[in-house]
Regions:
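N-terminal juxtamembrane segment and adjoining first transmembrane helix
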Residues: 1-66
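Membrane-embedded alpha-helical segments of multi-pass membrane proteins
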Residues: 47-49, 91-99, 153-157
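Membrane-interfacial loop-to-transmembrane alpha-helix junctions, especially the N-terminal start
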Residues: 67-71
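Membrane-interfacial segments
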Residues: 34-39, 64, 133-138, 169-181
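Hydrophobic transmembrane alpha-helices
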Residues: 17-34, 72-94, 109-154, 164-167
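Juxtamembrane or sensor-core-proximal signal-transducing alpha helices
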Residues: 154-185
Length: 202
């Protein structure tokens, strides 16, 4: 049941990742035309990392086992979100929880916890880098560590609330899926037994 769902979700995510190529190229074009002030070096990082993350799942789906492909896609997505979060010109807030949300599609509560922990660590690292270039640090004289702690506390409260909701949702969804699967299996067994009793081939 979960294996079949994993394969289907992997296929869905590879299509989503391919569509993300458009968003990545749009960011790069906006940077090169001066709409966004990313800087040339950061723009190249977005371009290279973004295209690798967006394109490789469509290739690896032919070779990697479903579970390994799933972990690869979730890991790389969070890394890219972390890269975006380090820049002061990109507002990354609730997006840090995007990977745990994607993990919910697999109906595995343990996966939601694992992706949640990893995503939180990426968020903390990105906030540390990002907070060094905030207005308060550069112009108001507040210390980097002071701003880092303030931002991290705010993000953490928001993050914990969202993760608690996600975990409860995926637990309920998995239970419903298992109950439906059990009912379908029971009906199938009853049908097979009836065919054996009646000798019907229908």
């Amino acid at each position: 049941m979960l294996e079949k769902n994993m394969k289907q979700v992997n296929q869905l995510m590879t299509r989503i990742y391919r569509l993300c190529t458009v968003a990545i190229l749009a960011l790069v074009v906006c940077s090169w035309t001066g709409i966004f002030e990313f800087g040339q070096e950061y723009t190249m990082i977005i371009l290279i990392a973004g295209l690798i993350i967006a394109v490789t799942p469509g290739i690896l789906i032919r070779f990697l086992p479903d579970r390994l492909l799933r972990d690869y896609m979730l890991f790389m997505a969070e890394v890219f979100i972390g890269i975006l979060g380090t820049n002061n010109h990109i507002g990354v807030h609730i997006t840090y929880v995007l990977v745990p949300i994607l993990g919910c599609l697999y109906f595995e509560p343990e996966l939601v916890i694992k992706t949640g922990i990893f995503s939180y660590l990426v968020m903390v690292a990105a906030v540390y880098i990002n907070s060094a270039g905030t207005y308060d640090v550069l112009y108001l004289g507040r210390s980097h560590n002071q701003m880092f702690v303030a931002y991290t506390l705010g993000f953490t409260i928001e993050y914990v609330i969202v993760m608690a909701v996600l975990y409860d949702l995926v637990k309920r969804a998995k239970k419903m899926m298992e109950e439906r699967y059990s009912a379908e299996e029971e009906n199938r067994m009853k049908t097979d037994m009836w065919k054996m009793i009646t000798g019907s081939s229908i």
